[in-house]
Amino acid sequence: MQDLISLEIVTPLGMIYQGEVKSVTLPGSEGEFGVLRGHASLVASLKSGVIDIEKADLNHELIAIDAGHAKVDEDKICVLAKGAVWVCGSDESEIEKNLAQAKDLIKSMSSDNAALAVTFSKLDNARMH
């Protein structure tokens, strides 16, 4: 049996993601942190960045968010974000469009050039894989 954890990502526009995942890496305000099933309960502030979702089949999905909060329990993660863009698509042009939207969202929320460079690098690397 795989140790999966429930993940929900919600914005003011509604549910962006809901499912069982293997792990999640979140852009915490004090740095990135990973969550697996059985993690200690916590509430954390999130900064603009990328949520890296590792699914049960070990594939990764990325969702760019602006600031928000995460509530972590042993078997569930709930992310409340001001805005989010799913960085995936069915073809190359859709992926490029979503990637540009994700970069615009993050750029509008951050003035930290070093943090922007790291986030954009993560998005660009994910597109190539």
From Swiss-Prot:
Superkingdom, natural source: Bacteria
Keyword Ion transport applies: yes
Gene3D superfamilies linked to this entry: F0F1 ATP synthase delta/epsilon subunit, N-terminal
Keywords: ATP synthesis, Cell inner membrane, Cell membrane, CF(1), Hydrogen ion transport, Ion transport, Membrane, Transport
CC terms in the record's Gene Ontology section: plasma membrane; proton-transporting ATP synthase complex
Molecular-function GO terms, alphabetical: ATP binding; proton-transporting ATP synthase activity, rotational mechanism
UniProt cross-references to CDD domains, sorted A to Z: F1-ATPase_delta (cd12152)
Pfam families from the UniProt entry: ATP-synt_DE_N
Main localization of the protein described in the UniProt heading: membrane
Localization: Cell inner membrane
Topology in membrane: Peripheral membrane protein
Quaternary organization: F-type ATPases have 2 components, CF(1) - the catalytic core - and CF(0) - the membrane proton channel. CF(1) has five subunits: alpha(3), beta(3), gamma(1), delta(1), epsilon(1). CF(0) has three main subunits: a, b and c.
Annotated function: Produces ATP from ADP in the presence of a proton gradient across the membrane.
Family membership: Belongs to the ATPase epsilon chain family.
Protein name in the entry: ATP synthase epsilon chain
Annotated source species: Campylobacter jejuni subsp. doylei (strain ATCC BAA-1458 / RM4099 / 269.97)
Taxonomic lineage: Bacteria, Pseudomonadati, Campylobacterota, Epsilonproteobacteria, Campylobacterales
